[in-house]
Amino acid sequence: MKKLTDTEKYYSLFREFYEACAGERARIDKCESMFRGDHWYDVPADDPKEPRPVTPVLHSSIENIRADLEDYIPEAIITADSAAYSELAGTLTGIIRENHLNCSYDEEFRKLTHDLLVSGWAVQEIGYDPAALNGMGSAFIRHVDVGSVLFDPVESDIQDGRAVFKFARHTREWMREHYPELADSMKDDGLFMDTDEKGYLTPRMDKSVMLIECWEREYDSKTGKHRVHMLKFAGGVMLEDSRKDYPDGVYAHGKYPFVVTALFPRRGSSLGYGFVDMFETSQRYSDKLDQIVMKNAMLASHNKLLVTGASGFDEEDLKDWSKEVHRGDNLNGVTWFATAPLPQYLISYIEQMRAEIKEESGANQWSRGNTAYGVTSGTAIAALQERSSKRARMAAKSLHTAFRMAVEQEMELEREFALGLRCIKTYIDRSDEEGARRAEAAAREIMNKEEMPISIRVTVKVQKTAGFSAISHNDTVFRLVESGMITPEVGLELIVFDGKEQAKALMKNSEFGIRNSESIR
């Protein structure tokens, strides 16, 4: 039996994963079709002219929950139980915040919410870009499309899988630009991505090549640690292999740089189900009943006339509404009959089904800001909105847990590659040279360790606190300041309002200017 080369071995593993996940890709495509209201495509039509109505209740409900999740965009706060690392923890918080501003994490979060609610699971990738920040380098967290990543279908934890694959098609011109020495060796590999079933985009597959990125994790029984490697191949050619340059692994933490979030977890899998899976049947039935109502309305809109042969009337003559007189023998041979109306309970049932989709998904009237009982107070409406968004809070909790895990990997990458330089830059920007020296010393100590000290931990808070919570929180802080239990400076740190960081910076600059003017005098 011929021994497979490394490239052939990884292609074989990729095909195994790809074929095993064919049903999952079909489910994701179906969920996207349901989300955009295009779910009649797989229903055969008895009559090509029959109506196919769509009332996008499910789409509206999902978008309403996504809008709620906009108030839950996470922010990482680094804390330290040890006083020796307290100053460094504050610096790390600023570094992580800068990373997320650079990679536009708020936009990545919006993409994650779409995948989570529609497809049922979302993926974040954690990596390091050495060219970022003008060559200083920084870690990043970004969204990965669920249709372009493959996990081991055998394992329920992605960290236990044989590999993780990312894949995308690129033109041969792109390949020549990035891999000029290997591009001409690439051949057609017979791999084609699932394309849009509507056929809006019909690319020439012969002008592109599938680029596959493979992450492989191996366990060293002697050291009791894992190593993670990255390989890239396309057109039957191995393009990159980190095992040559980094035999101990790409990243010291030895984990797959991916975090998966499942909305409704599945037993025995790292993936999940979404709102479309839960409410697909209700959406289909409500639209089917709409079709019945519309058919009935179209039939009722046409007057029907029964004419017997003994009536003596001509059918074509009766169709001519411009005539005032029609000649015939027997008027009893002409009978009008109307389409029977549908029962009223059918209309009520349609409304009830749609109301249940909104209510059970959490997109009810209170979460939309509507009230049916005359509530006009802004505070009361905000409180009702917060109470009604349980579904959104549940999804946000899952996303925040995944975000914390991603930030922990992000900190490990900063510690491994550039923490010392980042700390110096942070304090130099503040014109604090002494602080820069202290931070660099603490950073160097941590960088010499094999992993981040357990006393440094990540907590997650939302960037924007909900209106009702912010009002209640700030009122408590004001009372504590008025009673003298805390100082105004502490109160400023505790209160929540937009532009807080800018206000603090202006106050510090003002104090610095006053001290300088006094020293000159």
List each language-model region with its residue ranges.
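C-terminal anchoring/interaction modules
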Residues: 1-46, 116, 124, 130-134, ...
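Helix N-terminus capping/helix-initiation residues
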Residues: 64, 145, 170-173, 274, ...
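Short intrinsically disordered coil segments
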Residues: 140-142, 163-168, 277-278, 472-480
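Extended, helix-rich architectural segments
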Residues: 1-234, 239-240, 349-352, 445, ...
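Short conserved micro-motifs at the rims of enzyme active sites and ligand-binding pockets
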Residues: 135-136, 243, 270-271, 471-473
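Generic detection of long, well-ordered alpha-helical segments
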Residues: 82-89, 102-106, 272-283, 347, ...
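A broad, low-specificity signal for short, low-complexity segments enriched in glycine/proline
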Residues: 82-89, 192-194, 247-249, 264-268, ...
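Catalytic nucleotidyl-transfer cores of nucleotide-processing enzymes
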Residues: 224, 228-321
